[in-house]
Amino acid sequence: MNRHLVAGVALVSLSMTLTVARAFSPTIATVGQAVGAANGNSGAEPCARSPICAWGRGRDVITHEVRPPDMGFTYAYPFALPDGLTGGIAAVAINSKQHLFAFQRNPAGTPQLFEFDRNHQRVRAIGNDAIGHQNKAHGMAIDAEDNIWICDEHGDTVMKLSPEGKLLMTLGIKGQRGDWDESKGQRLLWQPLHVAFAPNGDIYIGMGHANESPNDTDKSPTNSSGAARVLHLDKNGAYINQWFGNKAGQGHFSMVHGLAVNPDNGNVYIGDREEYRLVVYDRRGTFVRTIQMRNLVCGLYVDPHHQLWMATGQDGQIFRIDWDGNILGAIGNGPGRGEGQFIESNYMAMDLEGNLYTGDTSVARITKMVAPRSERWIDVHT
């Protein structure tokens, strides 16, 4: 199937309340200011070891937006996945050869990582002999040397693969969830979701679904915080720093579902999905500011032109935003399974022609968003 649909402005019919807005200026709270009721935080101290009960969920207190798609992208579905594999596509990434990799949630004994050439042809699967079964495929990223990094949320590992698909490094221990604690010689991960890289090759790992389940959090004897976190390692996997989001309020977060590094200044952007916001730190983990959004922040991506993109997950759109959180354009027709729609898109990739790609965790398909060849788009990208 290779269908196209011009991005229009018609909105889908939805069962939840949605607001259409052609212009939105995000609320920005900097150091010393309170986000307050906008994100549902009560300001109270977090519950013992399970901070989830101290947070007001953004889904419940913030009105969602579906914006008119205004960037002129069209939609195509040229990638053929293997017959019989119906798992959702957790993530996609593109290497320097312009080959696309897709990370699929498939059952044990079936492949989960696929490579497609620039003509959309599937050229290989990286098998379980290299990566084992990924209990819950989540984020994926490709570094400057074309190494492939994959996150197994429920297996609690992050794996680094060579461009040829050979396993080079495993961070964490499969099936052992907990803290990374250098003082104990304990190097465990807690539901890793995504990976991002600093300009010097340093690694940032976002971990965050732990906060969704207090019972799960409290049952782990190896974990002392039960909190979402960012782990900072050097390019060889040596520990540098980490910071936690185990309190409500400024400088904290409930989830690290999206993660991106500004290549120009090294600032780390966290997509705090359930609080509908970006939380920004410098490269050393010092809090910079919070930027309140009006949608789920499910994925963040920096394109080859150093532009920032945000996936709204179950809100069914992708936004181009600036580094201050201002929405510059929208792609997608809202939640659904139709053309130009998404049930839950999280992670993206862009080729050198400006085409954008994403998967869907609930649908076994990869969407190619074909960039318009307009003067506006050329101006943006040059």
Where do the protein language model's features map onto the residues?
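Positively charged n-region of N-terminal signal peptides that target proteins for export
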Residues: 1-4
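Bacterial N-terminal signal peptides
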Residues: 8-17
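Sequence-structural signature of mature extracellular/luminal beta-sheet repeat domains
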Residues: 22-382
